């Protein structure tokens, strides 16, 4: 068996095209264009790349894109004050603060300062709580994008045994909630998990988000399983690889996401979907 590739790049492009059409329709109806504010603190090279991609995608679909680049040594109060002003700005539907933040700024305080109806990253405790209670509104972007990828396979998720490797607030934990909502029996694995191999070998669906190149051997993948590789790791030779040993995994899986071109583009597409949702549901 050779896995079918889940082309996140193509699916994300399809989403952006639909969003662009909706923005055009809003303009023609005399409605406001959605607005996204992106805040970057410091000059971390990876963060600059991510922020650049988000701003470019925003402009591509016709959203208003507002950029705020703050110095690494900016105070927490300065950042919170900027968020307060954007919370009150009627032209802005979504506020995104690129993580990680410098050590002197508390992530949770910043995330909770963003108004829940403008939390298009889906990180605010209110929005995570809505997902936990099975009434999601603004959902965490990477898990939301992954669910779109899984749906694209046409596989019925109800009753699947799913394993999520990684328990971060950004991916692992909300991913577990999304899969529960989709009817899976879900196991979340983390650094203290015993018998990881055994759990993965039994899984119909595996989502891996640990940030370690080739962490999951391909031969662990159950024949016919769906593999979603969230990792994006740059090797010393410049090659980008995922957290799963791709070639071997692709021999067993029924569907697999490539790295790059799998989950990454979907995270940004989901961010744009959330921004339009916030405009339509909360701010029109």
From Swiss-Prot:
Keyword Transmembrane annotated: no
Catalyzed chemical reaction(s): (6R)-5,10-methylene-5,6,7,8-tetrahydrofolate + NADP(+) = (6R)-5,10-methenyltetrahydrofolate + NADPH; (6R)-5,10-methenyltetrahydrofolate + H2O = (6R)-10-formyltetrahydrofolate + H(+)
Assigned keywords, A-Z: Amino-acid biosynthesis, Histidine biosynthesis, Hydrolase, Methionine biosynthesis, Multifunctional enzyme, NADP, One-carbon metabolism, Oxidoreductase, Purine biosynthesis
SUPFAM superfamilies registered for this protein in UniProt: Aminoacid dehydrogenase-like, N-terminal domain, NAD(P)-binding Rossmann-fold domains
UniProt GO BP: L-histidine biosynthetic process; methionine biosynthetic process; purine nucleotide biosynthetic process; tetrahydrofolate interconversion
Pfam families in the cross-refs: THF_DHG_CYH, THF_DHG_CYH_C
A GO molecular-function descriptor: methylenetetrahydrofolate dehydrogenase (NADP+) activity
UniProt keyword NADP present: yes
Amino acids binding NADP(+): 166-168, 232
Pathway: One-carbon metabolism; tetrahydrofolate interconversion
HAMAP family, sorted: THF_DHG_CYH
Quaternary structure and partners: Homodimer.
Function as written in the Swiss-Prot or TrEMBL entry: Catalyzes the oxidation of 5,10-methylenetetrahydrofolate to 5,10-methenyltetrahydrofolate and then the hydrolysis of 5,10-methenyltetrahydrofolate to 10-formyltetrahydrofolate.
Protein name in the entry: Bifunctional protein FolD
């Amino acid at each position: 068996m050779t896995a079918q590739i889940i082309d996140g790049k193509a699916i994300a492009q399809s989403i952006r095209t639909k969003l662009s059409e909706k923005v055009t329709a809003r303009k023609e109806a005399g409605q406001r264009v959605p607005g996204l504010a992106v805040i970057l603190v410091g000059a971390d090279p990876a963060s600059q790349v991510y922020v650049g991609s988000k701003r470019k995608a925003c402009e591509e679909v016709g959203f208003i894109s507002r950029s705020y680049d703050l110095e690494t040594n900016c105070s927490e109060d300065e950042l919170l004050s900027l968020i307060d002003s954007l919370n009150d700005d009627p032209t802005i539907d979504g506020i995104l603060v690129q993580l990680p933040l410098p050590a002197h700024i508390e992530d949770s305080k910043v995330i909770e300062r963003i108004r829940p109806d403008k939390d298009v990253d889906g990180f605010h405790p209110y929005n995570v709580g809505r997902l936990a209670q099975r009434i999601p509104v603004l959902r965490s972007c990477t898990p939301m994008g992954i669910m779109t990828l899984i749906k694209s396979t046409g596989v019925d998720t109800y009753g699947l045994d799913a394993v999520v490797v990684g328990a971060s607030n950004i991916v692992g934990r909300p991913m577990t909630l999304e899969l529960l909502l989709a009817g899976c029996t879900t196991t979340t694995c983390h650094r203290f998990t015993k018998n990881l191999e055994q759990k993965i070998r039994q899984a119909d669906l595996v989502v891996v988000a640990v940030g370690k190149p080739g962490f999951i051997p391909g031969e662990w993948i159950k024949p016919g399983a769906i593999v979603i590789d969230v990792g994006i790791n740059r090797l010393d030779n410049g090659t980008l690889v995922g957290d799963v040993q791709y070639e071997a995994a692709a021999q067993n899986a029924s569907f697999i996401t490539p790295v790059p071109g799998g989950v990454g583009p979907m995270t940004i597409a989901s961010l744009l979907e959330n921004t339009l949702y916030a405009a339509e549901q909360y701010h029109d």
